[in-house]
Amino acid sequence: MKSAIVSCLIGLTFIFFSCKKDDVNENNNGETNNENLNLDCSYENNNVSKTFDCNVQLEIESVFFETISNDTRTFTVNNIPSHSVGEFPNNANPHSISAQDETIEINLHPQEAGNLTPLQSSNGPAYAFGICLNGVEMDPVAAEPWGKNTSNENYDWNLEATANSLGLDCSNAHVQPNGAYHYHGTPVKYIEKLNPPANEMVLMGWAADGFPVYYSYGYSSANDNTSEVKSLKSSYRLKSGNRPGDGISAPCGEYNGKYVQDYEYVEGLGDLDEANGRTGVTPEFPNGTYYYVVTDEFPGIPRYFVGTPSKDFKLGPN
């Protein structure tokens, strides 16, 4: 899952990429991706994100089967969406979409673990988040540390995929070197196909730990399914001030959302917890469950698990 060549500055070429299970590094040329270390800090305020129109209808049929047996929910998928996609390869993502052949298992009866498991480790992406009901995986963390492929590589500062030019299409998705199409942020075209009514919660997928994933909306009173449905808000915000880095070992410049670490979680700021979820009733779980929410604002796709993630969503050697 599990990249992309963008032009670069000051004579350097660098590569943007996300991650996949067997090889989280999508960089085919072994070049550094971060802007010239030692650049003026004002450069870090240039937050450039470009997405490509979704004007291509794939000829490959989408495959998604779900079965339940004992304590396991099993998906058989090919990672091909049923919605239109961007043009791949493109000038920032040199890979073509191809069908995968995957069988994925998650816990049918998940339990909260008592501690959070991050999708990103100190060495890079550790897990993909989950799978949508069209068989495409949600994989929000990019393998884009500060100083990548240099002695200053620093995953304490990792580029936010949706805020940088990674060759994403209008559904915030792009393609791995192995051909796997995957979402880094709100899967716009998929949500359009779900066509969620404004007054209903709509299940959009399952997280790697087995808990359900909904898009944006939930009951205004978490445990009352007769209460008004509203757009649920994340409890993250941009930090104020400037990054503490020196521009060599870590980035400097004003916090502007270019890096994941430009954001901070503030308990109670919104409706959702640090994992971008909450406990409450849903149409599928009238007695209540923990559930995650994909929001249009950061973090979009959640960055933590409250339960124990399936090994089928593990990325790379982390």
What residues fall within each predicted segment?
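Sec-dependent signal peptide recognition
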Residues: 2-10
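C-terminal motif of bacterial Sec signal peptides marking the signal peptidase cleavage site
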Residues: 15-18
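Solvent-exposed N-terminal domain segments of exported/luminal and surface proteins
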Residues: 22-165
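Extracellular structured ligand-interaction cores
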Residues: 101-103, 126-128, 168, 178-182, ...
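Extracellular/lumenal glycan-associated surfaces
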Residues: 106, 132-136, 177-190, 285-299
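Short, flexible domain-boundary/linker segments around small modular repeats
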Residues: 133-171, 246-278
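Aromatic- and glycine-enriched beta-alpha-beta binding-site module
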Residues: 156, 161-195
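Extended, compositionally biased non-globular segments
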Residues: 209-211, 216-317
